[in-house]
From Swiss-Prot:
PROSITE patterns reported for this sequence: CYTOCHROME_P450
Listed InterPro entries: Cyt_P450, Cyt_P450_CS, Cyt_P450_E_grp-IV, Cyt_P450_sf
The name this protein goes by in its record: Cytochrome P450 monooxygenase bsc2
Gene that this sequence comes from: bsc2
Listed GO CC annotations: membrane
Source organism per UniProt: Alternaria brassicicola (Dark leaf spot agent)
Family of the protein in this entry: Belongs to the cytochrome P450 family.
Keywords: Glycoprotein, Heme, Iron, Membrane, Metal-binding, Monooxygenase, Oxidoreductase, Transmembrane, Transmembrane helix
Transmembrane in keyword set: yes
A UniProt-annotated Pfam family: p450
Amino acid sequence: MESAQIHSTRDSLFILWLTTLLVSVLATAAYIKFQSRPRPYSGFPLVTLGGPSETDSSHAANWFRRGRALVNKGLSELSGAFQISNGSGYWIILPSKYMDELRNHPDMSLRDALREENFPNYRGFDGFRQAFKDSTFTQEVIRVKVTQSLGLITANLANECQHALQENLGESREWQQRFIIEDILNIVAQLTSRVFLGERLCRDKEWLQITKEYARNSFMGSEELRQCLPLTRPLMQFFMPACTQLRKFSAAARRLIDPEVQARKRRAEEAIKLGKKPPKVEDTIGWMVEVARGRQVDYVGGQLALSIAAIHSSTDNLSKAVVKLCEMPEIVAPLREEITTVLESTDGWSKPALYRMKLLDSFLKEVQRLAPFTIVGMHRRVMKGYVLSDGTHLPKNSRIMVMNDKLRDSSVYEDPDTFKYDRFARLREQPGQEDQHQLASTSSEFATFGHGEHACPGRFFAANQLKIIMACLLLKYDFCFQPGQAEKARVIPFEMVETIDPTLKIEVRRRSEELDVTKVAKETA
């Protein structure tokens, strides 16, 4: 009897101890969450979609599904700066009128603005890790090597485009139904990889799958982690679907790319030992080796970083352009006429030839104007407190987004809500405006590639690649909406991004082009 009482007392004490421990842990977790919870910035109106009772989780959900609507609400209701929450922190939103004032300011950091949003120190996020570790390296590869080699790589891109079109759209003269977004993504991934990794890997099915999926899973993985308590993220990453996929893709990318990097290094070292110049290269994997100059570089992470930056935004522009051709078939003929005239009167696919395709350039830019991939012109972290010209104080360590909100402004564009494929071609005809309205040009009124010191360094490559693909699509194929599909040419929102519904089907058929694009490409190469 006495023994039973002792056991009962021990059980009661254990339960009391366990209860006390659990309460303490929960109280500590609640305290940590409260203390670490981001606070709104003083002096900036907080814009929400659900009112003042919104929680962090509802902030995150609204940002994920309706981020652009949230920001547009603030822009329409307020004339100056305001703030929003994406669930993991607050951002000050600034209209584009502040863009020129901030675009090159030394105390405004792009890298620090995005670092905590993208978890570069977590496994699998290798592309972000290399980009944030040494942003100057990637920029040097793009600005110094890729941009200055556009004349060299244009023919390679045109040639690869013929292979990619054949592989994805085929040669059928009959109308066929296609998931056009997926086809365009495949084509962009292959051409981009031709410049990034060379001829062999750009057709490797496993690599193409990695490069297409890595960016999507990077952003999804970041979103998954942002919705977790900071204390739990190091553990929760191993249970998140997108994070798990990222680790698999990163490992596979290393298996494919590392041997190529080592082979390039050996060839360069052997040439130097023999007193010769290293072999000439025409892809970023070789240019990375040249630019590294003894620096510790994660070459695979660098390639994944380029994939994040290059593929999905270009796919979006081209997808929306094809949709516009289906909506406005009357603009197809003048575009085809220009492309044919230029290719017949020049030496085929070349940088000067692409420059002369001004209607095509204008068409793609007008697509961007009315259907931009994102409406954010700049992300920055304020490294030192700063007072704007109108007296607005940006606190130290605050994060800001400057909007690209002039794209439909009637003070900038005549009849701004109407699609005019030749709008920018006509603007370039004005004295002194020749170089101001090209697809790759940036300004505070048109910042789809960003603006200022941190504008997209690869925009000149992107513009040339977009024109090559679009020109080949126009000359080689006809497009139209499948009956009942026009209404599916809608956009799907994701944070500040809007993309075409990937389930959209379009009718495609091979046509007899005005000149043999394949022959022109081969003769130019």
